[in-house]
Amino acid sequence: MFGFLIGVFFDRREESKCEPLVKHAPAIEPEASEAENYPLSSSADDKILAEALDAVETTILGSGSCLHVTDTAAMPPAGDSAAAAVMMGSHSPGDRLMIEALESVEASRGLTHSADTCSQRCSIALSAPQSPQSRVPEGPIMDSGQIFAVSGAGEEENWIDDEDMALCAADLQIDPIGDAQSVGGSTAACLPPSQKEEIRILYATDGYPVVCSLHLLLGQALLQELYVIAYSHVTEPSAHGGGLLRATFYLLAATGCERQRQRVRPVFVCSFTGEAADKTREALREGKPLMVQDVIASLDEAQSLALHEDLIIALGTICSAGKTAAAPGGDERNLSYNYVASTLPGLRRTLASLMLQYETRVVAAFRRKYNASFSCPFWFVSKFGPSETSLVAVLRYYLLGATQDDGIAGSFDLQGVKDLAVTFPKPGANASGLTAARLNTFAEFSRFWCCSELAGPKAEKLFREYLKTRVSSDTLYVQSLDSLIEKYRHALRLPAKDFVRFVYLAYHEGYNRAAVEAHMEEALRNGGRAETAATRAQSEFFKGLREMCSMPEYFARNVDVAVKRLPVRVAEEHARLRSYGEIPRSGFWGFCWPSYDVSLRINKICAGPLCCLGTQLADAMVRAPPDDGDKGTCAETAATIIHHDSDASGEEEATVKVCGAHMPRANKRAGDGTRISPACNEADTRAPLARLTALAYSDQRPRGIMPVTLLLYSLDDTSSGADTAVKSEAKAQDRPVPVYRVAMPGGGQAFAVVARDQWDKTVTVDVFSGFMAPKSPPESNGPLGSDKDAAAVDDAWTRALLARAWGTSYARRCAANVGASQLYLNRNEVLSDSLAVCNLPLDLDITLKPSSVGRPSMLTLHMAMRSVREAIVLLWSLLFADAEIDPDTYPVYFYKTQCDAAAGDEEASPQRRGVGGGDDDVAWGEEDVEIEEMWGGYYSQTAMNDDMIWDDAPDPQMDIDSDHPAHEPMDDGAGAAIEEMKTAAAARFCRCERKIGFRICVPIPKPYALAGLSVAKATSALVQQAIVLQEKFVEALDQFIADYEFVDSGVYSAGRSLRLPFFAKVNARGVMVGRLLPFLVFPPKCRDRSEFVAQHADPNNFHVGAARRDNPAPTLIITSVTVRRDVLAQDNRAHGKPRAGTARLADALAAVGIVPGNQQGTPGDACAVDASWLLDSVAMPALREYIDEHFPRHAAEYRDARTDCIRVYEGRICAALRRGGAGYMSGRRSNFTCLKYQHRGASMQTVIASVVVAVNSQGLPYAALQTRCFATKCGSNELQTQFTVTLSATKDV
């Protein structure tokens, strides 16, 4: 209990040092009542605690100031010796002497008494400056005549409660020089400036150092020697011998507050002179022990005892107070701390008395102050070692030299300082001949430490300079990397997943093992100074980041483009077979049906006309790719019942290749009149959309007829002129035809094949009919002054164009239940790898931050899209190097998804209705045929022809609002008009809540085309990179963008569909929302704005496979766009060396001189090796030799083992092992015993062994012994490899 409370005492002491009290105790008038002076006081202990706290505040705040503390303890008036004697607990005739001694002590301390004759209380007004005892005194502390009153031999010891003692001591515990003496602080500040040389010494003893040190303070030598653990020079060493040497001896500290954790505490101070100084210097140089008698002779008693004054007074006061209160006639309520403390004798006598009566408890108190738990040098070696640098230089700096504010490494922990010392030059051989591993006694440790080259004052100074330089270098390194990473963090504008990857890779680049080792090696060469921090930007990683910040440089270094040049005639044929050509914009030829009707049509065509034309396309249209694992014949499962109205091909025989075999076409009919088709069964039939695209995009021409022609027209025998019509149209339609997916209400979908359509009369009529171009300023057809002016003109034209779009009217936004009508509300082009990419539609979705940040204005959006256009045109000029691209005139067509709450229609917003409208811009092809067949809204071909006219088309003669700001006359000049446009654009805000969707259609310039969707995907990824590098785009939308990954590259996959401009998507309530409408972004030098606006309605500008008029037959086909692995790309390559498992086993055996037993099989294959010969002649002898050497106890089991159940795989041979011999044949168990453990009982002999011969990662053949043990500790029959041996023709390793 006592020890715990003393610990509390030290903790509170440290807190008081870190946070000094600032309040002053007010003076209490003499008339104050007892209740006021001692509120809620019930015992003398409480009163002592209260007074002790006042005294602590006095000691803390009394330095250099006048402080008044009122003591409310009852004291006798001056001169009342009897009362004083009673209070002192002394009944001897010498009371008068003690009273006089008290008065002299009070006078020496500056105490003045003021007695109150009307009361038994008296007030002591302390108005003295700092007492000499509160700091390091130069003279005697107290009169030597003062005697500590102790009990006689027969008296009973009287102690107050341990808790009260500890709390009182905690209040009194103030280290007057704690700041100067703690943590290797500046002791020189507390010493006279006249000293020539001063050092700090950390010491140890063979016995318990705390007890030895207390006796040493009292002039007693329990042990003969002290050992130097470390020493540090405070001042420069003396140039001549015999000079004054002042040494402060330290022990490890045990306590300290969080702000200033003390590592060592001073114990005593010595002033060595003459021969004693020379002996001490010699002992420090050679590591000899210090003689305790010499230390006692040179002990500075006043200085040393002052280091412990607070603790000695606290212990003495409490003990004395307890004795006085217990004395006969003593009143425990009339005790005063100041009075009791003033009765104490000198510090040495007080300490001697305490040690005489209460040695155990005094030692316990000092144990809380000093950590002397180490009993051997191994403690220091384990903490600071094992290298000599850390054991000498680090130990001295960390314990004796470091302070929190030294500007070097004072705030570092021990491991941090040791890490810094790694690059410090290693010292030479220790003069003592000892090593850290041989330090068994403190004498050896002292000799090792002092004889080190790092122990001298020059080495100490050099190490401190090194630490300072190294910390500065490391700090520069870290700060440079952090600033560099922070710079790119804001410059790259990466998507979320790439941003996380960038942060990890950037810090890994700066702090990986190789980088840190390079930095440390340079610091080692340059004495702690490393200049690589400023040049880290030259590494490959940061070079790659800089390249990513410049699109031309990034493209030149990281993008490879493969181009195929076609002759003109081949290019024309390629364009005919791989593109739609120019899509007609008048008339109608096509259909829009649900998947069930589409399947019927395809089945009908495949069973009839295609087979009659003698083509193998029919089976490819209906069969899914065969499963490689299916070993059955297709003839047994190929029959599918197909309802057919008539047999257009007659009963003639034909052959169709099914699964690689030619089969005679079935000419029999089932009992219900249906015909058995050679096609596959329904389980193997491809999905309707895949079959539809295969027909629509097919480049085969059986008998000169495209399969899409057969798809568009029914080959019904009842039509007498069907064949003629087919041939006539086939000659006209000799190109692929667009295939569309149409989203229906309720989650259904239909499919459409439309060769020509009335785009101007049905699709875009509501947007462009009656469009009146704004009356722009005279220079509006030329370049404008700024991007903001151009964006304002773009917005004015966009508002004028979309004034009458049906998307702004709720009455015209209801989805149709009939496919042909819904075809004009929602249409998604199905993508295919069979088509060349002539226009690249980009799906741009900008995810927005929460609505609290606001929404961008239309002026901001137009400015952002203009920067997007600049990025795309720049990329196009790099990607299509041979094309003539004018950045000021090249067309890029923008379409924006209508806002969620368009035209103020609250019900149009899915978020406001509580309905989650899905994103139907991009969708997969149908994957569940049953869902489509459940939709009952399909209709016949006749019904389709009746619904082709859209009844909701607006009247072309409808007038446009003449009050539109864009149509106002420009009489006031162009500047005023543009300012009005900017004001109007800035006042209109986008009302999209989650994201802003754009469709950007970019024509491929003449004479280029992209070969397939993989090239389109790579190109779109480059567009993403180009956009984020546009500073204007980032500046405009950075505060709104939640994720910088907005270009969807995953849409370019076969079977996926992309919504076309001018079409909307259907939400869960059957309402059409989010229609893609033109968002005009004029080129800087647009020659004709009206013509440019009209081009947005041309389907040849936004269909992927539509050939434009200016590029009908591309001659340069980009076959691949490869982006080299940039610095942020994930490394998908296998780590380490490529495994040689793919290497041929026979080749590996031949390489080491093992000749196969036969030459059968394919050369280089495992089959070319005689497995039995290899196992019995090569593998088993090698395994037996290894077992004999390492498992001799099991050698007998494997000596007669034989191989069984040999299995030959590609690259390896496996075989089971059986125990041979007569025992095996007689029925004895053939299993083996465990090689790892000695099992008992049923698990004793349950191991199944096998051998494997394969090729390792170095390409060498090896044999491995694998076992399965049924014991639980062996994994319960888990396959384990026990060992491997490398096979060789000469010997087995």
Curated annotation (Swiss-Prot):
Family: Belongs to the herpesviridae DNA primase family.
GO molecular function: DNA-directed RNA polymerase activity; zinc ion binding
Keywords recorded for this protein, A-Z: DNA replication, Host nucleus, Metal-binding, Transferase, Zinc, Zinc-finger
GO biological process terms, semicolon-separated: bidirectional double-stranded viral DNA replication; DNA replication
Record-marked site positions (Essential for primase activity): D843, D845
ZnF bounds (CHC2-type): 1234-1274
Coiled coil: none
Record-linked InterPro entries: HSV_PRIM (IPR033685)
Keyword Zinc: yes
Location in the cell: Host nucleus
Keyword presence, ATP-binding: no
GO cellular component: host cell nucleus
Biological source species: Psittacid herpesvirus 1 (isolate Amazon parrot/-/97-0001/1997)
Entry's EC annotation: 2.7.7.-
Matches recorded under Pfam families: Herpes_UL52 (PF03121)
Self-association state and partner proteins as the record states: Associates with the helicase and the primase-associated factor to form the helicase-primase factor.
Protein name: DNA primase
Function per UniProt: Essential component of the helicase/primase complex. Unwinds the DNA at the replication forks and generates single-stranded DNA for both leading and lagging strand synthesis. The primase initiates primer synthesis and thereby produces large amount of short RNA primers on the lagging strand that the polymerase elongates using dNTPs.
